[in-house]
Amino acid sequence: MDYSYDLEEVVEETIDYKDPCKAAAFWGDIALDEEDLANFKIDRIVDLTKHTIHTVSGAATNISRPEKGRRTRKERRRSREKRASTSRPERVWPDGVIPYVISGNFSGSQRAIFRQAMRHWEKHTCVTFLERTDEDSYIVFTYRPCGCCSYVGRRGGGPQAISIGKNCDKFGIVVHELGHVIGFWHEHTRPDRDDHVSIIRENIQPGQEYNFLKMEPEEVESLGETYDFDSIMHYARNTFSRGIFLDTILPKYDVNGVRPPIGQRTRLSSGDVAQARKLYKCPACGETLQDSQGNFSSPGFPNGYSAYMHCVWRLSVTPGEKIILNFTSLDLYRSRLCWYDYIEVRDGFWKKAPLRGRFCGDKIPESIISTESRLWIEFRSSSNWVGKGFQAVYEALCGGEVKKDSGHIQSPNYPDDYRPNKACVWKLSVSEGFHVGISFQSFEIERHDSCAYDYLEIRDGSSETSPLVGRFCGYDKPDDIKSSTNQLWIKFVSDGSINKAGFSLNYFKEVDECSRPNNGGCEQRCVNTLGSYKCACDPGYELGQDKKSCEAACGGFLTKLNGSINSPGWPKEYPPNKNCIWQLVAPTQYRISLKFDQFETEGNDVCKYDFVEVRSGLTSDSKLHGKFCGSELPAVITSQYNNMRIEFKSDNTVSKKGFQANFFSEKKNNIQKLQQLNEVNRGQQNQAPKRVRPRMRLRTVKKTRPP
């Protein structure tokens, strides 16, 4: 699988999130803002670290410690207030719903890991992760220079980042970081930790002592749970150690006859689950069901339920699937409007989703099919009437008609392996006048030369007879796809043998912005892309800072053996106030020659205004070969080494046609031989003897008259 990073921060260009890398300080992988620093007793941190609270730049920040006895009454009162995010309501996500966005700089495999980690939290708690639509507060999975870090709890007032740095894209580590997002500090910082673990300070790396601070009772709420060695939020025994075999934190006693292991990054512990359920006030009964089919029933079924019960079941299947829910048994107290005992079914992920039905009595409801991939089922009892309760079964249905302008479709059971013998057909329709655009996030389907076994088939239209766009399998993501109408037909098929991770794609309505009368606002060229567009420029020009206008381009770092360069806008007049630098680099033992074919700049005896400057080397103080201006063509220039620097400058007044030049590289020996041969030829011409023009002698012959 591809775990490489594309460091181009796609989401960051458009989202102004709360960046953990710009935090006031760090506490391990926890980002602290100014409010956190104001609320915590920083003097305790300084005692241990000797002025080493790590900032984002890696430098240390000095924080002076207040003298004992000098704290004000207000400060003493503030120290008694509860300060940890788990005890502060504003840091808890409302209704346990956490909207998220995954930045564009992650591969499909990494995105799958993030979703697996979120589903893990959902399965064991009542927390819900939801792809963000228009929510103000949400998290952004991104890759930041500070590595793996997050704020604790909801910060509010906009997006906040959770940074998943290199080597952090592992399931357990992402589950740990999401624990901070949900609202948990590290387990070993609990106030009662000294009763359970020993901190071996002499083994801690210098400057990292602050990571082993413990919080005071008024600063954290442990929610009545006992110390949890097995917590995924606990440090390992050698964390921040001077050596890999030196322990920094050790349990003080055995559990069931053995020293308990700490620092696991495999799954949530029972203690993690219990604390999260308490923090988010999860109902005492009910659960999150994520399998493709299953059943659930009221507590005690069929022997009756108790009064004053409250249970919630959250059914969640793969995006692109729907849920069919059938009640197989129903026996609740009957009342007008089902006022006392009832079951509510809502079409979505939470209690405010559209109501599909409220049921009581003994009449079994008709089948309910969800609009999307989630259902919310709530059961309440308030009477003393004893009935059997209810029982229900559900099943995930893949495919169907989808009439939305945007959304997600994934193979059944994604990001886990898809199931055998599946056949799913989706018919996508977006608004009239638009096209359907598809962009793949990940793709892994059993490989075959003709995609005969497992495959994804896409057709340009609304039926299986529409023109075929392609049949895809293997591990390479298909290119983006755009329909010719507002409809697209998608079919996924798996056989009974090999199963893979499947696919994940986004669909959306697509319009050609470049067809608008203003050319998309672009000065020269408009390039339509899937879901958007971009401006481009003609050869010799580059985009301006507004990403719409074009200006003459120039300069660059060139490693070709030969090529050409020219002034901006050539052969038109160059623009004013340009400063272009070309850096030419050839292989070692090569030399670069520059030959001007055309040359015309503003003329001046000392080349003060517009000029071309050529140097051997890459810096502005390298050996100067010449500074040229006017209309006289410079002679051929050969570099002293294997690199050359050419700089062109124009002022804000007169502009001329500029220049056009070719460069070529040859090995030093070849150039030396050529130079030597030229010198020999010149020498031979100088030393050759002068040719003597032969003299012509005239001899007079006396002619005799014939007889």
UniProtKB/Swiss-Prot annotation:
GO BP annotations, alphabetical order: cartilage development; cell differentiation; dorsal/ventral pattern formation; ossification; protein processing
Domain Peptidase M12A: 84-283
Disulfide bonds: 126-282, 146-168, 148-149, 285-311, 338-360, 398-424, 451-473, 514-526, 522-535, 537-550, 554-580, 607-629
GO molecular function: calcium ion binding; cytokine activity; growth factor activity; metalloendopeptidase activity; zinc ion binding
Start and end residues of each stretch annotated as Disordered: 57-90, 682-707
Residues that bind Zn(2+): 176, 180, 186
GO cellular component, as recorded: extracellular space; Golgi apparatus
Cofactor: Zn(2+)
Basic residues composition bias: residue spans: 68-81, 690-707
Post-translational modification: Proteolytically activated in the trans-Golgi network by furin-like/paired basic proprotein convertases, cleavage is not required for secretion.
Domain CUB per the UniProt entry, residue ranges: 285-397, 398-509, 554-666
Origin superkingdom: Eukaryota
Residues bearing glycans: 62, 105, 295, 326, 562
Location(s) in or outside the cell: Golgi apparatus, trans-Golgi network; Secreted, Extracellular space, Extracellular matrix
Coiled coil: none
Active site, per annotation: 177
SMART domains named among the record's database cross-references: CUB, EGF, EGF_CA, ZnMc
Cofactor remark from the record: Binds 1 zinc ion per subunit.
EGF-like domain: residues covered: 510-551
Record-listed E.C. numbers: 3.4.24.-
Major subcellular location class: Golgi
Function: Metalloprotease involved in pattern formation in gastrula and later differentiation of developing organs. Able to cleave chordin (chrd), suggesting that it may act in dorsoventral patterning during early development by regulating the chordin (chrd) activity.
Binding partners and assembly: Interacts with olfml3/ont1.
Protein name according to UniProt: Bone morphogenetic protein 1
Protein source organism: Xenopus laevis
Organism ancestry: Eukaryota, Metazoa, Chordata, Craniata, Vertebrata
Name of the coding gene: bmp1
